Amino acid sequence: MKLKLTDKLLISEKSRPLVVAEISANHCGIKKRFLKHILIAKKSGADLVKIQTYEEKDISINLKNLNKNYNLKNNYRIYKKTKTPFSWHKDAFKFAKKN
């Protein structure tokens, strides 16, 4: 059996293992840094990049009154700063094909 993943990547039972890089919140919500991570993954030998896409409203709620006794952080604000929005996908694919 053979499976064509991209124009340049065909895999089969005899193929070497694929190297998959993951980009999550390590770009700190900066699109330019996100795109740079794609390039770094390629230069490091990754065959594919897995993008962990989320937006703050999808995984958290914006709690206004956190209990100060528990030293809680507002995860909504943290996710908002580090999100990988779906709107970045189109540019990411263009960038990856170009580079």
Predicted regions and their residues:
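Conserved, mostly hydrophobic/aromatic
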Residues: 22, 41
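Aromatic- and glycine-enriched glycan-recognition loops and surfaces
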Residues: 27-35, 77-90
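Alpha-helical scaffolding segments of alpha/beta enzyme cores, especially the outer helices
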Residues: 36-40, 91-94
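Non-catalytic positions within long, well-ordered alpha-helices that form the structural scaffold/packing
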Residues: 42-43, 97
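N-terminal amphipathic alpha-helix/helix-capping segment at the start of soluble metabolic enzymes
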Residues: 1-20
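Glycine-rich, proline-tolerant flexible connector loops at the mouths of alpha/beta enzymes
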Residues: 44-84
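Structural/interface elements that position substrates and couple domains in central-metabolism enzymes
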Residues: 17, 72-75, 97
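A structural motif corresponding to the C-terminal end of an alpha-helix
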Residues: 87-99
